[in-house]
Amino acid sequence: MKRRNFIKLTSTASAAGLLPIQLNASFKFLNSFSNCDFSNRKIVLIELAGGNDGLNTVIPLSVYSDYVGMRPNIHVPSSLVLPLSNIDSNLAGTNQDIGLHPKLSGMYNLFDQDQLKIIQSVGYPSANRSHFASIDIYNTGNDGSNWNNGQNSGWIGRFMENHYADLLPTNFPMGVQIGSRNTSLGFHGLNEHGLAVNLSGQDSENFYSVLSGLSGEYPSEFPDSHYGNELQYIVDTDAASNVYAQAISNSFNSGSNFSGANYPDTDLADQLKTVARLIRGGIQTKVYMVRLGGFDTHNNQVQGQGDIQGKHYNLLDELSTAVEAFMSDVNSDSIGDDIVGLTVSEFGRKAQENGSNGTDHGQVAPAFVFGKPINSGVSGVNVDFSEATASNNFQIESVQFDYRQTLATIMQDFLGSN
């Protein structure tokens, strides 16, 4: 396993001794870690909902024959794969020799621009292959030993309460979620549950006017009772919503998108386009979460042997083109210097294809980390297909990187958490 930096630092990273070497010293800063300005930094989480098929996303070229043996009908033909060794010749002939699905040309370009890290076999110790349980485990930051280890708070919410305590409550939302009508458990703090605004189904420009039209006179006093406490919570939440709505509306109207960013007409592109406009408009929101659904590809993942068009083909195209346009947008000026994106999927897929040109629920999957602060490279090695047998239902179970390691690296080294 090659020791390749994930983020370039000129001094020792805060996560040293906590994380594997591939996740230590991970961001490319020009100044020493102690002098970094963290104030404007933001992360953008892209949820690939449904369980992305990592083996058809990041193709393991060093064990390609084993891959084809497990997937005779749905494998990506080698002639179509985008080999990363064409960019980094050090990968060729090693157990890190990988290629990208042909519809990930945007991600391939980011790798070429030194802005994409690929992390292999991301997961957690006690894998749960329920969509609902696994995404809750990811959002709460736990190991999967039970549904959520007794936690009812999320890692984002706890991070915000601990690291940005002086900003709570504030005049802008600490988090903005788009793409899912259910607000993510990840944004729930131990004490605060109103840290994020969910814009799903909303027009950001008119968000404030919609909310403000619902407001009236708040009561000045509350009964000293359970009812009074609940009423005060509702009033406080409504007041915060109006404040947040004003901040979102102002930022959206003040912001703009780079005219040269070629956003496609897709749902994910619209979500990321909104994020870029809000950031350029000056809002100080720290964490954005967007969503691309449809990755539960039990059938018609491909059309058939040799024809990789199908559900997964279209999803990866939507992901890649949206991310490439977003990066073109934010990198057109200095705001891109302070943005890191990360893909998250609740689990991967089985090594073996099923009988419906698809794949069933698996465990580990690769993650993409991208942005100007990121150093291109590969962390981890290609999977060992010999562990996928009938006795374990053809699962790849070996976790190379606990998802919490990736999150901890970003929070500590990029956002400056302690």
Language model regions located:
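Feature for exported/extracytoplasmic and membrane-associated proteins, marking the mature portion
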Residues: K2-T321, A325-S332, Q352, P366-N418
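Active-site lining segments that contact anionic ligands and/or coordinate catalytic metals
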Residues: T285-V287, G336-D338, V344, G362-A365
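Histidine/acidic-residue-rich catalytic or RNA/ligand-binding cores of hydrolases
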Residues: N354-G358, G362
